[in-house]
Amino acid sequence: MEDSGFNIKYAKLFIKRAEEDLEVAKVLLKTNHYPDSVYHSQQCVEKAVKAVLILNGIIFRRHVVSGVFRNVIYEMKIEDSWKEKLLNLIPKIESLEEHWVMPRYPEPYFGELWNPLEEYTKEDAEECLKDAENVLEVIKDFLKEKYGLKQI
């Protein structure tokens, strides 16, 4: 693993990309591109979580991050209030993880064809966006307090 200066820079880049994904999700929602909005909400959360993992010495190249994130939360020496706030994000993270493939591709699914253009609704996109905003906000606040990352 690289030195902590490298990890801080790396984590900041992940947060910047998470912020961009969130903005893209908003634009796509406004233009009625619901599956793609859902996907970018998922990407926002994945990248925000990976920033925390990086600052804990973990480079994780998979899309399902909730389990590793949960373990890191339990291992970190942090105040109980932060532990609780971060653990409360897990259900939202797990819910969004379900959307890293499904919004992008039509697929055979239980004998039928899954068509994301027909399956994802405005309400789905709004809910995913709301969850992504919440997860990103809490993680950014945590990174500012725990790691002193003021400029993220």
From Swiss-Prot:
PROSITE patterns to which the protein is assigned, alphabetical: HEPN (PS50910)
HEPN domain: residues covered: 15-135
Keywords linked to the UniProt accession: Toxin-antitoxin system
Pfam families cross-referenced by the UniProt entry: HEPN
InterPro entries reported in the protein's UniProt record: HEPN_dom
Top-level division of the source organism's lineage: Archaea
Function: Putative toxin component of a putative type VII toxin-antitoxin (TA) system. Its cognate antitoxin might be MJ1305.
Official protein name in the record: Putative toxin MJ1304
